[in-house]
Amino acid sequence: MFKTITPIDNTVYLERKYNHDKIEDTISNSVKAQKNWAALKVKERVEILKKFVDDLLSRENQIIEEITRQIGRPISQASSELKGFKERADYMLSIAEKKLSIINLPEKQNFKNYIKRIPIGVSLVIAPWNYPYLTSV
């Protein structure tokens, strides 16, 4: 059982059960989903991520309360993290197609040289406690 203790009053804010099999299943499902993700064009991925950002931000009040309870940040300051998250996400999504496009390099000895960025696997982000949403972008 994982417990989150709120620094506000040192009580248990939430508890999450886990087991090894569920963790393994989650990783396995992530690997399967990543193959589908990699098959999408960058433009399609960008559209999906824009919807994700909108969906996340539609829960702003809930997230602000969670940030406050989990890390003790005053509720009046917690919304700034989500504003920063949106600014970063919007910027990264605005440059994604250009930055992830194929880079053609000069040919050498009848070889076509290029750099192609492709999604190659699943990653796990363990965000720092002080800016859990902002640093996820």
Each predicted region: which residue ranges?
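N-terminal Rossmann-like NAD(P)+-binding subdomain of aldehyde/semialdehyde dehydrogenases
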Residues: M1-F111
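Conserved small-residue-rich beta-alpha loop and adjacent elements
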Residues: N104-V137
